Regions:
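Helix-turn-helix
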Residues: 3, 7-41, 45
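Amphipathic alpha-helical segments used for helix-helix packing
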Residues: 81-103, 117-121, 150-154
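C-terminal effector-binding regulatory domain of bacterial HTH transcription factors
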Residues: 179-196
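Generic hydrophobic, amphipathic alpha-helix propensity
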Residues: 1-4, 21, 46-50, 54-58, ...
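Amphipathic alpha-helical packing segments from all-alpha helical-bundle domains
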Residues: 52-55, 101-125, 135-140, 147, ...
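Hydrophobic alpha-helical connector segments
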Residues: 45, 59-84, 137-141
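Short coil/turn segments at alpha/beta junctions that flank glycine-rich nucleotide-binding fingerprints
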Residues: 10-14, 85, 127
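Alpha-helical DNA-contacting segments of helix-turn-helix folds
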Residues: 41-50, 92, 108, 112
Length: 196
């Protein structure tokens, strides 16, 4: 699987062949087919393993501490994964076959947003906010962290992942810290509601 991960990360799903993976792993194609069925099976197994690793890293860091500490720990864990597992992050973020795409980064983001949303719900209720809007903020923050991970992997390596994570966490936390109960800007004109 390590060889498959490296090849998929470097070349993408479409350009990778089982023959190439088998050759680099020093085994025959039938061995790869016996274990994974087909290229999609190997890819799915790699995506599942990477997803489990990333979710476990983040989940283990958000179980304790203040809301701000948990948020910063989650960002640090995500950025740590991006830095320590560049091939895994590449596999999760590259184009993949439609059948497997739901297993990749989209599923990871959904899972992380759900976990962050659970934390937000309880904190919103405690602070007197509607917990119904927690998924909006959870998805926004998880999306922000994911996009910064893409940026760092592609061109942001002049910054340490710890520094990047702290900046992202500060931005997210300050936004949450000053969250108004009514997010409507007073001077923004709204379109009248249409009837019928």
């Amino acid at each position: 699987m390590e060889v498959g991960r490296s090849v998929f990360a470097a070349k993408g799903y479409e350009a990778t062949s089982i023959e190439e993976v088998a050759q680099q792993a020093g085994v025959s194609k039938p061995i790869v087919y016996e274990h994974f069925g087909a290229k999609e099976g190997l890819y799915a197994a790699i995506v599942d393993r990477e997803m489990e690793d990333l979710v476990a890293r983040v989940s283990s860091r958000i179980s304790q501490g203040s809301p701000r500490e948990r948020f910063e720990e989650a960002v640090l864990a995500f950025m740590g994964y991006v830095k320590e597992e560049p091939a895994g992050f590449a596999v999760l973020t590259r184009d993949s076959p439609t059948a497997v795409a739901r297993r990749g980064l989209t599923r990871v983001i959904d899972d992380l947003a759900q976990r962050v949303g659970d934390v937000f719900r309880s904190e919103f209720e405690r602070a007197g906010y509607s917990s119904k809007v927690a998924p909006i903020y959870a998805n926004a923050l998880v999306g922000m962290v994911t996009q910064v991970g893409h940026w760092w992997a592609a061109e942001g390596k002049a910054f340490s992942t710890e520094n990047v994570a702290r900046h992202v966490a500060a931005l997210g936390w300050m936004g949450l810290r000053h969250l108004p109960k009514d997010p409507s800007a007073p001077g923004v004109k709204r379109e009248p509601k249409r009837r019928g």
